[in-house]
């Protein structure tokens, strides 16, 4: 995967994910810092006139779902599931939010989403390199498994009960749905609670990454 966003390149470099760097000799403080780090780490730097500053990084390595579950259990933490979310920028923004609030990991469906691309990496501000990300075949089955392990499970939906009216206990898992399709019915059926974020304006919903932030902040308050 080729990255052109300097912030994402720096985060990938610090995590040892950069294979090589390309540039045409342009300099600014951020690029100079990245080049210095690359030299110290022994990352090859290729200079070519007209070449946009970029970095080739190794593919995102997905974590095992069981690893994230164990991490949430032992740390009394929470997991973010993204159901029917296909826009790479939204995926990246949600991953950034999850990492910021200390989630044990993020879970994506194997179908429809595909692999994480540059748009998600950029929107995550490099958070994709700092938080475990897993992919599973069936969200409903995964949620069912978590319930048996003692997780509180939540699905976000406009027709749900108010978030503030629900008693939240950790470990927990929250499922955020795509803006077009939302959380699928089988997944909602498996969750302990179907909840919404109450608002007072004329617009009846939030961008999914904003909604994810509110849910995860609420859960993080139970832990920290």
Swiss-Prot record:
GO molecular function: RNA binding; RNA methyltransferase activity
Residues annotated as transmembrane: none
GO biological process, one term: RNA processing
InterPro entries listed in its UniProt record: Alpha/beta_knot_MTases, rRNA_MeTrfase_TrmH, SpoU_MeTrfase, tRNA_m1G_MTases_N
Keywords, comma-separated and alphabetical: Methyltransferase, Transferase
Superkingdom of this protein's organism: Archaea
Any one annotated GO CC term: cytosol
Chain residues that bind S-adenosyl-L-methionine: 177, 197, 206
The enzyme's E.C. designation: 2.1.1.-
Family listed: Belongs to the class IV-like SAM-binding methyltransferase superfamily. RNA methyltransferase TrmH family.
Protein name listed in UniProt: Uncharacterized tRNA/rRNA methyltransferase AF_2399
Taxonomic path: Archaea, Methanobacteriati, Methanobacteriota, Archaeoglobi, Archaeoglobales
């Amino acid at each position: 995967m080729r990255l052109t966003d300097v912030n994402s390149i720096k985060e990938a470099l610090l995590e040892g994910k950069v294979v090589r760097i390309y540039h045409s000799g342009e300099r600014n403080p951020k690029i100079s810092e990245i080049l210095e780090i690359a030299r110290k780490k022994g990352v090859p730097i290729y200079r070519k006139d007209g070449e946009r500053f970029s970095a080739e990084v190794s593919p995102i390595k997905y974590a095992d779902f069981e690893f994230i579950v164990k991490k949430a259990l032992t740390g009394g933490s929470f997991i973010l599931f993204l159901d029917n979310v296909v826009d790479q920028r939204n995926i990246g923004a949600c991953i950034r939010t999850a990492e910021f609030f200390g989630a044990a990991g993020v879970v994506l469906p194997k179908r429809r989403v595909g692999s994480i691309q540059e748009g998600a990496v950029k929107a995550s501000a490099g958070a994709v390199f700092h938080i475990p990300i897993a992919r599973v075949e069936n969200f409903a089955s995964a949620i069912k498994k978590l319930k048996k392990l003692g997780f509180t499970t939540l699905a976000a939906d406009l027709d749900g009960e108010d978030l503030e009216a629900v008693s939240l206990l950790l470990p927990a898992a929250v499922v955020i749905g795509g803006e077009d399709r939302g959380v699928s019915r089988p997944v909602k059926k498996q969750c302990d609670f179907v909840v919404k974020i109450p608002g007072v304006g004329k617009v009846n919903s939030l961008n999914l990454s904003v909604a994810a932030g509110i849910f995860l902040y609420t859960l993080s308050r139970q832990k920290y």
